[in-house]
């Protein structure tokens, strides 16, 4: 059994301006279990920054969008990796959290792992959420069957328990939020270079209405600019690929240099590139050129 864990691992800088009058933010989320869980998760990191909030539930995305644009709610929390690079008119990213663990994980139920060849994973059917993850996993483990699904995390858990899948690729953050126990689950994290994460992975973002200046001013004080610097590179490349079949991860080292890994499915084949530069200027463009270059 999974005991959901609400402890915050996404954090905003604790530098709230004491002379700023705080208000209670209204957080809008969908009624489905994973969205509600993420809403509570969001409340945790807002509280860490001195901001009180309340959750309001909605039936579907259209109702949620209408509530945001009509000022019924102030923010809608999303995982940055799940956010399209072009937002609907009237919406904007108001704040990004600090970056949590970006790694992808192979997750198997213990009853599967105990019988499997964990070196090759031969014969296992593993669920993945998109084509680039399918291609990356198949390159690492040629003897598996990687199958694309559209299940939410809690649905993916159930699919592994009932045998629909032998395992799944999940984000490390998801395994933390769901407090997945080692006695029930085998979890193998991948290095971000060998299995490139999705653009924005490990970052929570708060979407606000563009004209809600009060909320945007409040959240500006907790927005993580260092994270924005690297995720902007990732999302620029993602946009160049029309938000499809692309994974991207940018990090800055202690010397101030940027290291950018990307993977894409081009003409049905996996292509990967890693670049290092002293600046982010032109980094996404160079990665695109390298990924599309014919050998």
Predicted feature locations:
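Small-molecule-sensing regulatory modules
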Residues: 2-61, 139-295
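Short, structured active-site "lid" loops
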Residues: 61-86
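A conserved helix-loop-strand patch within extracytoplasmic ligand-binding domains
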Residues: 81, 87-143, 213
């Amino acid at each position: 059994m999974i005991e959901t864990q609400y402890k915050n691992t996404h954090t905003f800088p604790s530098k709230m301006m004491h002379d700023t009058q705080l208000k209670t933010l209204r957080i809008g989320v969908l009624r489905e279990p994973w969205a509600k869980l993420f809403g509570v998760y969001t409340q945790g990191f807002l509280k860490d920054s001195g901001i009180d909030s309340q959750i309001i539930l909605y039936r579907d995305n259209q109702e949620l969008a209408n509530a945001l644009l009509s000022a019924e709610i102030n923010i809608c929390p999303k995982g940055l990796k799940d956010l399209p690079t072009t937002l609907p008119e009237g919406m904007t990213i108001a704040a990004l959290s600090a970056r949590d663990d970006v790694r992808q994980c192979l997750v198997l139920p213990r009853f599967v792992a105990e019988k499997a060849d964990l070196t090759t994973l031969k014969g296992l059917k593993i669920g993945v959420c998109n084509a680039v993850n399918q291609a990356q996993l198949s390159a690492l483990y040629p003897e598996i069957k990687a199958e694309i699904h559209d299940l939410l995390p809690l649905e993916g858990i159930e699919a592994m328990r009932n045998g629909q899948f032998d395992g799944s690729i999940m984000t490390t953050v998801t395994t933390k939020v769901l407090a997945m126990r080692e006695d029930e689950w085998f979890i193998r994290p991948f290095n971000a270079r060998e299995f490139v994460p999705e653009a924005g992975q490990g970052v929570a973002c708060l979407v606000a209405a563009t004209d809600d200046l009060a909320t945007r001013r409040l959240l500006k004080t907790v927005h993580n600019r260092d994270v924005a610097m690297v995720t902007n590179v990732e999302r620029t490349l993602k946009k160049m690929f029309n938000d499809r079949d692309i994974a991207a991860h940018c990090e800055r080292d202690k010397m101030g240099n940027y290291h950018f890994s990307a993977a894409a499915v081009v003409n049905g084949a996996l292509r990967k590139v890693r670049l290092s530069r002293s600046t982010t200027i032109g980094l996404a463009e160079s990665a695109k050129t390298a990924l599309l270059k014919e050998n």
